[in-house]
UniProtKB/Swiss-Prot annotation:
Keywords: Cytoplasm, Glycolysis, Lyase, Magnesium, Metal-binding, Secreted. InterPro entries: Enolase, Enolase-like_C_sf, Enolase-like_N, Enolase_C, Enolase_CS, Enolase_N. (2R)-2-phosphoglycerate binds at residues 168, 340, 369-370, 391. SUPFAM superfamilies: Enolase C-terminal domain-like, Enolase N-terminal domain-like. This is Enolase. Its EC number is 4.2.1.11. It is found in: Cytoplasm; Secreted; Cell surface. PANTHER family: ENOLASE (PTHR11902:SF1). One of its GO terms (molecular function) is magnesium ion binding. The lineage of its organism: Bacteria, Bacillati, Cyanobacteriota, Cyanophyceae, Nostocales. Its cofactor is Mg(2+). It comes from Trichormus variabilis (strain ATCC 29413 / PCC 7937) (Anabaena variabilis). The active site is at residues 210, 340. Its main location: cytoplasm.
């Protein structure tokens, strides 16, 4: 059992670093009296929900085009650190509630969600290090043994790529694998085969922010056809072994009550019918942000139409916020929630939102952001919470692969206790 003297916070240090897009982000270290240290880095999104917690940027055009985070770094070093020194790192909720109270706003706009989250995650890592246990075990206890099904973003569009594709992500989902290691191999083989399929058709094989290919395509259906072709060419059965998933990111092309895709506006009911047709025609198991983040009435209609056949994930809709998730539960809008740590800005609030969803039959998908770092916290979080699903990009770009490799290590550590979510029917449905 830990001694509070040993696990007391001795020092907190933050610095400005770069994310995978070459933009500044914040890194924090939490040092304990025992000598244990926790290090955490915070990601940043491109397609952001209106209701996300506030990411504090400097807006000084003379540095990084105004995207610097020196204000957030200052807030950690000069505002948060003095109030957190001597607190017990094991008491995660006390640390997080103290920071939230110091900020005093409803969306962390005073000190910055990026500042608060960096310290929150670093404190958790320091706590785990002080006990000599991995982060997933520290957060999840002895039941943390479920390896997630990866939703692998292999064709990028929308805000994640400089192409003409409307939907933001087209994903492959190795639901039929028996282990995470096998699932990762299947995904990597399909990804490599997709490169060949694109090349044979004279399409570009450059990649977007999340490591997926970003070709110009005639329609969203063409992207789905390419994925089915790649799955089959790689030697797998579409749907049975490797399924498909979409991140529509519909808020990005919602204009004046209409959904503008394929070059023209469509009424919400027409768009819902279109999504239903895609579910009928392709082995799709999950659709994320199928409608605008404030289009609650039509979210209900979409859920009534296809919610029994496919997972409907709220990202911009819920923004990892328990209050918005509660509204979705009450209104029967969607049936799953995307979990992004920096949307809410603390580990405690993230875990509370996951718990709320679980208690009400909503599945959780633990997710990265398009602007990532080498930080692998979300891999441990997925196992700790038994979420059963993770989104962390494609099968290239080291900031994406780092999370997959972390999950491989966790699976090895767990040994015979490791269970792959897809093998026991706990992946997306």
């Amino acid at each position: 059992m830990s001694n509070i003297v040993d696990t007391a916070i001795e020092a907190i240090v933050a610095r400005e670093i770069l994310d995978s897009r070459g933009r500044p982000t914040i890194e924090a270290e939490v040092h304990l009296l025992s000598g244990a240290v926790g290090l955490a880095q915070v990601p940043s999104g491109a397609s952001t929900g209106t209701f996300e917690a506030h990411e504090l940027r400097d807006k000084d055009k003379s540095r990084y085009g105004g995207k610097g985070v020196l204000k957030a770094v200052h807030n950690v070093n000069e505002v948060l650190a003095p109030k957190l020194i001597d607190l017990d790192a094991i008491n995660q909720e006390l640390i997080d509630r103290t920071m939230i109270a110091l900020d005093g706003s409803g969306n962390k706009s005073n000190l910055g969600a990026n500042a608060i989250l960096a310290v929150s995650l670093a404190a958790a890592r320091a706590g785990a290090a002080s006990l000599g246990i991995p982060l997933y075990r520290y957060l999840g206890g002895p039941l943390a043994n479920l390896l997630p099904v990866p939703l692998m973003n292999v064709i990028n569009g929308g805000a994640h790529a400089a192409n003409n594709v409307d939907f933001q992500e087209f994903m492959i989902v190795p639901v039929g694998a028996t282990s995470f290691r096998e699932a990762l191999r299947w995904g990597a083989e399909v990804f490599a085969t997709l490169s060949e399929v694109l090349h044979d058709k004279g399409l570009l094989t450059g990649v977007g922010d999340e490591g997926g290919f970003a070709p110009n395509l005639e329609s969203n259906q063409v992207a789905l056809e390419l994925l089915v072709a790649a799955i089959e060419k790689a030697g797998y059965k579409p749907g049975e072994q490797v399924a498909l998933a979409l991140d529509v990111a519909a808020s990005e092309f919602y204009k004046e009550g209409q959904y503008v895709y394929d070059g023209r506006p469509h009424a919400p009911t027409e768009f819902i019918d279109y999504l239903g047709q895609l579910v009928d025609q392709y082995p799709i198991v999950s659709i994320e942000d199928g409608l605008h983040e404030e289009d609650w009435q039509n979210w209900q209609l979409l859920t009534q139409k296809v919610g029994s056949r496919v997972q409907l994930v709220g990202d911009d809709l819920f923004v990892t916020n328990a209050t918005r998730l509660q509204k979705g539960i009450q209104e029967k809008a969607g049936n799953a929630i995307l979990i992004k740590l920096n949307q809410i800005g603390s580990l405690t609030e993230t875990l509370e939102t996951i718990d709320l969803g679980t208690r009400n039959g909503f599945r959780s998908v633990i997710s990265h952001r398009s602007g990532e770092t080498e930080d692998t916290t979300i891999a441990d979080l997925a196992v700790a919470t038994r979420a059963g699903q993770i989104k962390t990009g494609s099968l290239c770009r080291s900031e994406r692969v780092a999370k997959y490799n972390r999950l491989l290590r966790i699976e090895d550590e767990l040994g015979d206790r490791a269970v792959y979510a897809g093998a026991v029917g706990l992946g997306p449905k």
